[in-house]
């Protein structure tokens, strides 16, 4: 079974609308649908902000259902090397605001090469792969974005991927984040962000939906 998560409803809406629904329910007050996409059994849910909630929700679904792989679809802020509308797959994940004695790079969790290869092979869209950095704040200042880029080499930032990756690592589950760039950190205005979010908010999930129709995970 596959678990598909998004922060907000728009980020999983294509799959909610098109899946063959077998069950509807709530877990930790979050709405979910269980059903079939292609030949894959899928559970889809949304509704969390920040690393703590992302980890909490992920673990709850891993405990409730017999999950083999987890996908996180949604949006991210771009760093140097990407532009608005680009789709990024995480091949690794790091918490940029997690201070340790291990050095500036922090603790990096690798993504699933198997999931990555299948999504790239069956998607009809150009996809970038690289490190996704997560933290519990919006990165709106250019200098902060440049610092994160320098320390981590990340393509983009969000508030959840690294947390979900860590939970999946500890539970020995495959994980992949698919994120669409909706703004460039330190460059876009709030108005531009909202416009881009309306345009691209569902794109990552739409890509995964198309892949699941073609491929068995």
Swiss-Prot record:
Q: What class of enzyme is it?
A: hydrolase
Chain positions recorded as substrate binding sites: 77, 139, 159-160
Q: What is this protein called?
A: 5'-methylthioadenosine/S-adenosylhomocysteine nucleosidase
Q: Tell me which Gene Ontology terms the entry assigns under biological process.
A: L-methionine salvage from methylthioadenosine; L-methionine salvage from S-adenosylmethionine; nucleoside catabolic process
Task: Locate the active site.
Answer: 11 (proton acceptor), 183 (proton donor)
One MF term from GO for this chain? Answer: adenosylhomocysteine nucleosidase activity
What is an example of a Pfam family matching this protein? Answer: PNP_UDP_1
Q: What is its EC number?
A: 3.2.2.9
What InterPro entries is this protein classified in? MTA_SAH_Nsdase, Nucleoside_phosphorylase_d, Nucleoside_phosphorylase_sf
Reaction catalysed by this chain? S-adenosyl-L-homocysteine + H2O = S-(5-deoxy-D-ribos-5-yl)-L-homocysteine + adenine; S-methyl-5'-thioadenosine + H2O = 5-(methylsulfanyl)-D-ribose + adenine; 5'-deoxyadenosine + H2O = 5-deoxy-D-ribose + adenine
- Annotated GO CC locations: cytosol
Pathway per the UniProt entry: Amino-acid biosynthesis; L-methionine biosynthesis via salvage pathway; S-methyl-5-thio-alpha-D-ribose 1-phosphate from S-methyl-5'-thioadenosine (hydrolase route): step 1/2
Please name every pair of cysteines joined by a disulfide bond in this record: none
Q: What role does it play?
A: Catalyzes the irreversible cleavage of the glycosidic bond in both 5'-methylthioadenosine (MTA) and S-adenosylhomocysteine (SAH/AdoHcy) to adenine and the corresponding thioribose, 5'-methylthioribose and S-ribosylhomocysteine, respectively. Also cleaves 5'-deoxyadenosine, a toxic by-product of radical S-adenosylmethionine (SAM) enzymes, into 5-deoxyribose and adenine.
UniProt lists the family membership as follows: Belongs to the PNP/UDP phosphorylase family. MtnN subfamily.
Gene that produces this protein: mtnN
Per UniProt, the keywords (alphabetical) are: Amino-acid biosynthesis, Hydrolase, Methionine biosynthesis
């Amino acid at each position: 079974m596959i678990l598909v998560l998004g922060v907000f409803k728009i980020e999983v809406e294509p799959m909610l609308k098109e899946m063959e629904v077998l069950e509807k329910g709530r877990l930790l007050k979050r709405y979910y649908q269980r059903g079939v996409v292609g030949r894959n059994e899928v559970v889809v849910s949304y509704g969390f902000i920040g690393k703590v909630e992302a980890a909490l929700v992920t673990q709850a679904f891993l405990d409730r259902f017999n999950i083999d792989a987890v996908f996180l679809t949604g949006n991210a802020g771009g760093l140097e090397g990407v532009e608005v509308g680009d789709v990024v797959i995480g091949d690794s994940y790091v918490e940029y605001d997690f201070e340790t004695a291990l050095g500036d790079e922090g603790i990096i969790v690798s993504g699933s090469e198997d999931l990555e290869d299948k999504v790239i092979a069956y998607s009809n869209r150009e996809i970038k792969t690289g490190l996704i950095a997560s933290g519990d704040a919006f990165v709106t200042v250019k200098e902060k974005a440049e610092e994160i880029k320098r320390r981590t080499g990340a393509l983009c930032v969000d508030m959840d991927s690294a947390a979900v990756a860590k939970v999946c690592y500890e539970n020995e589950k495959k994980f992949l984040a698919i994120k669409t760039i909706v703004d460039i950190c330190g460059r876009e205005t709030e108005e531009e962000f909202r416009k881009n979010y309306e345009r691209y908010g569902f794109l990552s999930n739409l890509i995964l939906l198309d892949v699941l129709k073609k491929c068995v995970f």
